[in-house]
Amino acid sequence: MIAAKNAGYEGIGLRAETYVDALNEGLFDKDILAILDKHGMKVTEVEYIVQWAEEHRSYEQKYKEQICFHMCELFDVKQINCGLMENYSVEYTAQKLRELCQRAGKYIIGVEPMPYSGIPDMKKGWAVVKAADCENAKLIMDTWHWVRANQPVDLSVIEDIPADKIVSIQINDVWERPYATTILRDESMHDRLAPGTGIGCTAAFVKMVKEKGIKPNAIGVEVISDAILAKGLEYAANHTYENTKKVLEEAWPEVLQ
């Protein structure tokens, strides 16, 4: 977090597992809040609820869900990011999303389409969110997932989706050649690129978001990369921040003000 702050970042996304690890190390909520305050940082996103469409959810998943709700209350975060690896029909998935949204109450459930998941693209993502018909059911747009789902960076992909149904965006970049389909998730979890340093899709992606009139709760930089991280936290934070800033200065300078 200190490296992120020093690089220029204003906030962080926090996973439920990371929060629980902090508690397990002996920290209390007040301690975590004090650390954030000391470094002038805030939590802007909470994640990651999965397996929410299971007919019989495990207690682990139920507990994790409640932890996410608590984290939103603690850190004053409006949204929880969610994914779904299992593949079900639109109708069934929408029903389970509706139930999750009801449990979430005032918090927004941000559904993230991922090409190797049960919600692989924006088309199915919107079909599910639309059918769920909940005010707090929305979508997340991620550059890497977008490109690897073979979606053109074009407004036509989201022409039927209201701008206010996109809750946040996550930006990064991709290699020209994807991993094989069977191991595509490995690329997602280990080999992403900083914005503007791959095939160069990030600026166009951000411009598309701007032109659509989307007002994201958060613009996250999600660069999961073993190679970048191997160079150290300070390098990773500076490298991703500097390249993100370049992209935003080109595509959407207003958000930097």
Predicted regions span which residues?
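Short, conserved active-site loops that position catalytic residues or coordinate cofactors/metal ions
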Residues: 7-17, 45-50
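Active-site acidic/histidine proton-transfer and metal-coordination neighborhood
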Residues: 35-42, 52-139, 203, 232-235, ...
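Short catalytic/ligand-binding loop motif for oxyanion handling, primarily in non-cytosolic enzymes
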Residues: 22, 89, 118, 178, ...
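Glycine-rich, proline-tolerant flexible connector loops at the mouths of alpha/beta enzymes
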Residues: 13-37, 87
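Histidine-acidic metal/acid-base catalytic patches
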Residues: 1-8, 73-76, 105, 122-141, ...
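Conserved beta-strand positions in the central sheet of alpha/beta enzyme cores
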Residues: 13, 45-47, 81, 110, ...
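Active-site-proximal loop/turn and secondary-structure-junction residues that shape catalytic pockets
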Residues: 16-18, 49-52, 79, 84-88, ...
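Residues that cap or flank secondary-structure elements
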Residues: 23-24, 60, 92, 117, ...
